């Protein structure tokens, strides 16, 4: 395989962008393991006082990821996130105003491999969320598993990540005067296995838990489609029924984590590696679907609102696809 190396005279800004994305990929793939390793090293080194203090902290703080987390604006304002945003670049697109007197559930589509668009738009302050949607506070929900990793949990909470448990979503949406936004990647980890370039397959037909929560809380539903999310990585071919796909799905059921085998470019060359391609991401926030609070929603009400949401998502995609390079004949595939 011929390796295409990056030229030496790359501007400093682009080098900083690459560095920013490298630390993000490292954090996503390896930082949790490193933090667990540090914790084990402290045990082996018998640093008992420090360990006792941290274990006590974990005991007292264990429920925080399910109670709105603990964001630090100074972390969300780190300059590294500006370079992260500019690498692709990432752009947040508003289609209409959102009244801060309501709470919202934003369904984010598609998952992609590493959910770069969701992180860049809702976990940093560099794509203009606060300016586009004044009075709203975004909470991006991820697998509860990550909040069990010592030290790593503090880092991911600092940027506004919270648990995807039902308790966590209900807590975010319980704000009586409105202004909170739960961002749920509704396709879940399973959808990442379909994150191939050009793929428009969304795992959503059986995903109705967020619909039920929206009805119980009276939270308005907002479809969000991130154009370019699936273009960031190549993935080893894994069609349904293949041996690789069966193994991946089995591991996903056991561990709750999907393991897509992906690759793209490297730091100093463009031929292979785990760095994403420089492809633009346009995250389009659709129009809200009003939802009346219903303490005990029936199955018919859940189905009806789910169909309404699917229609709004399809409409959002069709309205914007040509602008972002999707051929006219292409449409979303719901599975």
UniProtKB/Swiss-Prot annotation:
Pfam families: DAGAT (PF03982)
Residues glycosylated per entry: 125, 180
CDD domains registered for this protein in UniProt: LPLAT_MGAT-like
Gene assigned in the entry: mogat1
Matches recorded under InterPro entries: DAGAT (IPR007130)
Protein family (similarity comment): Belongs to the diacylglycerol acyltransferase family.
Entry GO MF terms: 2-acylglycerol O-acyltransferase activity; diacylglycerol O-acyltransferase activity
Annotated protein name in UniProt: 2-acylglycerol O-acyltransferase 1
Record's keyword terms, sorted: Acyltransferase, Endoplasmic reticulum, Glycerol metabolism, Glycoprotein, Lipid biosynthesis, Lipid metabolism, Membrane, Transferase, Transmembrane, Transmembrane helix
Pathway of action: Glycerolipid metabolism; triacylglycerol biosynthesis
Enzyme Commission number: 2.3.1.22
Membrane topology term: Multi-pass membrane protein
Catalytic function, reaction form: a 2-acylglycerol + an acyl-CoA = a 1,2-diacylglycerol + CoA; a 2-acylglycerol + an acyl-CoA = a 1,2-diacyl-sn-glycerol + CoA; a 2-acylglycerol + an acyl-CoA = a 2,3-diacyl-sn-glycerol + CoA; a 1-acylglycerol + an acyl-CoA = a 1,2-diacylglycerol + CoA
Organism per entry: Xenopus laevis (African clawed frog)
Function: Involved in glycerolipid synthesis and lipid metabolism. Catalyzes the formation of diacylglycerol, the precursor of triacylglycerol, by transferring the acyl chain of a fatty acyl-CoA to a monoacylglycerol, mainly at the sn-1 or sn-3 positions. It uses both sn-2-monoacylglycerol (2-acylglycerol) and sn-1-monoacylglycerol (1-acyl-sn-glycerol) equally well as substrates, and uses sn-3-monoacylglycerol (3-acyl-sn-glycerol) with lower efficiency.
One GO CC term, this protein: endoplasmic reticulum membrane
Gene Ontology annotations of biological process type: diacylglycerol biosynthetic process; glycerol metabolic process; triglyceride biosynthetic process
Transmembrane segments: 24-44, 47-67
The keyword Nuclease belongs to this UniProt entry's keyword annotation: no
Major enzyme class: transferase
Domain of life from the UniProt record: Eukaryota
Compartments in which it is found: Endoplasmic reticulum membrane
